[in-house]
Amino acid sequence: MATIENRLEEMLKSPVEALGHTLWGLEYIQAGKHSVVRVYIDNEKGVFIEDCAEVSRQVSAVLDVEDPISTEYTLEVSSPGVDRPLFNAEQYTAYIDETVKIQLTMPVAGSRNLKGTVTGVEGQMLTLTVDGNELIIALDNIRKGNLIAKF
């Protein structure tokens, strides 16, 4: 069975791409009777507030027609930002040798929260070097992953 995030991604990918952007990822957060649909868009030229507003209008129209969420929700559209969330193998691969922080569903090496350097991605497995130790982590065990920006 597809998760709500997967259904939303399938539903929203084409409309976002039709506007010239990439659907970087999305989050669906349910909190009681209210939910948040957070849509991240990216573009080679950068993402501006006007882009977010345009995508928000289009996505809102699609969600109104398809009606995939039965509760009240807030729609948020933004760029991934400098501490961009990472959603899939392709995105982790793009940031090899970069530092990330991840939250896991099941502990690895006794921890659910890790910070380390992405040293490889093979299939659906991430290799993360944490304090000199190489850890192999299944991508489906990652609840949340973010790039740590260098300044």
UniProtKB/Swiss-Prot annotation:
Alphabetized, the UniProt keywords read: Cytoplasm, Ribosome biogenesis
A single BP term in Gene Ontology: ribosomal small subunit assembly
Report the subcellular localization: Cytoplasm
Q: Which GO terms describe its cellular component?
A: cytosol
Which InterPro entries does this one have?
Ribosome_maturation_RimP, RimP_C, RimP_C_sf, RimP_N, RimP_N_sf
What the entry lists under Pfam families is as follows: DUF150_C (PF17384), RimP_N (PF02576)
Question: Quick check: keyword Transmembrane in the entry?
Answer: no
| Chief place of localization | cytoplasm
Q: Where are the transmembrane segments?
A: none
What SUPFAM superfamilies would the database entry show? YhbC-like, C-terminal domain, YhbC-like, N-terminal domain
Instruction: Spell out the HAMAP family in the cross-references.
Output: RimP
Query: Belongs to which family?
Result: Belongs to the RimP family.
UniProt function note = Required for maturation of 30S ribosomal subunits.
Q: What is this protein called?
A: Ribosome maturation factor RimP
Organism the protein comes from: Shewanella woodyi (strain ATCC 51908 / MS32)
